[in-house]
Amino acid sequence: MSERFPNDVDPIETRDWLQAIESVIREEGVERAQYLIDQLLAEARKGGVNVAAGTGISNYINTIPVEEQPEYPGNLELERRIRSAIRWNAIMTVLRASKKDLELGGHMASFQSSATIYDVCFNHFFRARNEQDGGDLVYFQGHISPGVYARAFLEGRLTQEQLDNFRQEVHGNGLSSYPHPKLMPEFWQFPTVSMGLGPIGAIYQAKFLKYLEHRGLKDTSKQTVYAFLGDGEMDEPESKGAITIATREKLDNLVFVINCNLQRLDGPVTGNGKIINELEGIFEGAGWNVIKVMWGSRWDELLRKDTSGKLIQLMNETVDGDYQTFKSKDGAYVREHFFGKYPETAALVADWTDEQIWALNRGGHDPKKIYAAFKKAQETKGKATVILAHTIKGYGMGDAAEGKNIAHQVKKMNMDGVRHIRDRFNVPVSDADIEKLPYITFPEGSEEHTYLHAQRQKLHGYLPSRQPNFTEKLELPSLQDFGALLEEQSKEISTTIAFVRALNVMLKNKSIKDRLVPIIADEARTFGMEGLFRQIGIYSPNGQQYTPQDREQVAYYKEDEKGQILQEGINELGAGCSWLAAATSYSTNNLPMIPFYIYYSMFGFQRIGDLCWAAGDQQARGFLIGGTSGRTTLNGEGLQHEDGHSHIQSLTIPNCISYDPAYAYEVAVIMHDGLERMYGEKQENVYYYITTLNENYHMPAMPEGAEEGIRKGIYKLETIEGSKGKVQLLGSGSILRHVREAAEILAKDYGVGSDVYSVTSFTELARDGQDCERWNMLHPLETPRVPYIAQVMNDAPAVASTDYMKLFAEQVRTYVPADDYRVLGTDGFGRSDSRENLRHHFEVDASYVVVAALGELAKRGEIDKKVVADAIAKFNIDADKVNPRLA
């Protein structure tokens, strides 16, 4: 039942009203009915009735009336002085960096508009990590980082040297431009740029906390996830796209705080409209608790005196472009162009000075109004809350930026502007010192210093603060625990099924089974994982309140409050966010979880690449499984599904470790290696990307001594003898079998011998080669290091064929010890057909490997060129067909 609409206490009266309007419509027409309704609404507005209730848009006033405001628990004057120092230090941080003329950039206006909001939260709401839980998880708006640094400096957590090194990180002891855990691993928890990542990440972080609690893994009941956002940022699809998830999951541990300063980078967010109304309607419709913080305490008297309802009407009518302009002018302008619109509103301020009018504050700059909103959010149960805080961009910055379209880009300021800020916020800096752009500090024992630290101690300590590693020791499975996968498989299976079997091995391991988090974007049946539904259950905070259609089946669709699988529906970005929350739980919760997100490989890095990059920044640890991979392997799905480049995208992320295994035993070794590296003693900040296939074929036993090569990226699979020269053949994934077939043809039909290599990771081999070359360049007097691939291979001509773009295997060209290295790949758009036809079309099958190998030998003069031409004819290769890259 909605709080706004209690049960009808007088149905007879209600019926009378409804019948009356029906009669008017019937007898006098729609226009007359509309007129009467308008008059009723106007009269209701005078009486303070929320005339838009039920439409999702209420009057343009505070949600919490004055009489319901709680008493403010802090010392307002002390907090003002502390806040003024933080404001000042934030601006000094940017100005002092800008003086170095290094073109560093920086943003001042965003924090100035939200400083009071953050200050109230730091003093009264943000709980730090403690012995019971990980504290509140705060997604700070990216552009306000100078303000957070300024507070940490006052707290003694950052030094003046660090502030002076804002955006200067190369030589150490600097501060990152925005929240970046990679760059400040003990400070920032969550990267929130690019914009849009914060809100959707916060939703799934809140969901994951509920998941941990419902599964009995950790008590997260006192934790709140706060996401601080900009109204301009809300245009990002990621910002609003998942808000209904918060309602579905009953995320009352989630609070969005949208700083509605009405401006984005270039100008107004909605100059001709009202962004707060727009957001209110969206969130109200999505089932959130909406709290508007529109006007500060100085408006309370005027609203009490507004017996005509004209002031509220005026507030409702005024568009954002005007509200922005008002705060870039002065009190006289506001008197004329706002209050002067109606005689009733002009009369309200007739005896006010222009200065009094100018001092009318917006809600986002009033600690009392802000505190009331956050306390109400804290008390709300069963639904997420959004706080819409009306603010001014560049608040207090005067002519330099306040309410101006240029505010976001302001990073320099003349001394008149600096003096204005000093005077505006009563900052204790003398005229003699102001040219030095000094920072403000509070001596130990001062009122401000004592209060600042006392408030944080009440809330368990300081934040942001990040825990780089988890403290417990996990008992991980040994490679022998995956023994069944290391042996020859009795039936043909795919590497995807090999992954599922490896997952089942871990689910039987008492030490880590509860830490596994299988994540699916509505494709479990595609990947053969439906057997897990009944085995470990699908997480649902509501349990299962219905009888599933397939209840009589062994693998029925079982939802459970304690379910282990996160089934995110057709929502790759949401599934990715759940994976990221689980993959960073080792830090946020000191509770290492082991997530496996399996998906169509085409819809991974290509679809959610920005999130994958952020995962690297956030130091995620977990497994991404790119199922149905390979341009020609997912054969029937066509152009948009067939992945031939996810490994190109994954290699752009420095701490993403990528593999393209061909055999079940390779999958087992790689997964075991990932467990050891991420969750073993080293606790490496990497995550694994493993592509798996939907093609069934024979899986041999692991050759003796192959383990090291599987981990490092290459090992020799077999040698086939020949009498007329020798080549080296490299393959990965599904195409490795075609490479092996080519080796047989070369030996049988042409007498050419081959060394055949399984390349599990061209990317890791390339990185190893680059590392060796760098070391050798910088250590000219030392014995040169040799790339691993050069240690394994020899100088015979080499041919590589994969189900990915040529660039994938081209990565290692420099490090291959052979002078002749030919790469085959699947450049071009995919299409639907049989695997056989597709592999021939993309020129990666056995016939093309044979022709390429013969061609390399012919270049060396070891065989006649006619042999190559005859092979082309033998395999029915159309030498003049369109290049598949262009086809």
UniProtKB/Swiss-Prot annotation:
| This protein's name | Pyruvate dehydrogenase E1 component
Keyword NAD among UniProt keywords: no
Q: Coiled-coil segments, which residues?
A: none
User: Which domain of life, per UniProt?
Assistant: Bacteria
Which cofactors, by name?
Answer: Mg(2+); thiamine diphosphate
Task: Write out the catalysed reaction.
Answer: N(6)-[(R)-lipoyl]-L-lysyl-[protein] + pyruvate + H(+) = N(6)-[(R)-S(8)-acetyldihydrolipoyl]-L-lysyl-[protein] + CO2
InterPro entries reported for this sequence: PDC_E1_N, PDH/Transketolase, PDH_E1, PDH_E1_M, THDP-binding, Transketo_C/PFOR_II, Transketolase-like_C_2, Transketolase_N
Residues that the record marks as modified (N6-acetyllysine) are 716
Q: Does the keyword Transmembrane apply?
A: no
- What enzyme category does the UniProt record give? oxidoreductase
Keywords, comma-separated and alphabetical: Acetylation, Magnesium, Metal-binding, Oxidoreductase, Pyruvate, Thiamine pyrophosphate
Question: Which GO terms of type biological process are on file?
Answer: pyruvate catabolic process
- Recorded E.C. number(s)? 1.2.4.1
Which cellular component appears as one GO term in the record?
A: pyruvate dehydrogenase complex
Q: Name one Pfam family in it.
A: Transketolase_C_1
Q: What role does it play? A: Component of the pyruvate dehydrogenase (PDH) complex, that catalyzes the overall conversion of pyruvate to acetyl-CoA and CO(2).
